């Protein structure tokens, strides 16, 4: 588990910046894929972020958990919606998903707190 999901996400920025500089076409394409897949359509963006969070838990991607917990929060997801999402991830991912679901609720709760001054 992370002591601070806000700090953890900020720590990824330099490495991601290097990746964008080193592989600009790949990262531009990846960004386009992300934007296209998360755009509102039959499903709204919040629902898509909740799906992405569930997949992040099931695939055990800490970085993805942080990014999608934050995005779900920014799109208005409630703690109750997060728990329902995590329940689905646990159902699909069994035991390991339980451990990563704990990461996801921890990330959501930390990211929902106002930044320390």
Where are these regions (language model features)?
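Immediate flanking context of iron-sulfur cluster ligation sites
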Residues: 42-59, 80-85
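Short cysteine clusters
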Residues: 61-64
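Iron-sulfur (Fe-S) cluster-binding segments and ferredoxin-like electron-carrier domains
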Residues: 67-79
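Charge-rich, acidic-biased intrinsically disordered regions
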Residues: 76-86, 113-117
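C-terminal structural segments of small proteins and small subunits
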Residues: 83-109
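Acidic, glycine/proline-rich low-complexity segments that act as flexible tails and inter-domain linkers
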Residues: 1-47, 99-117
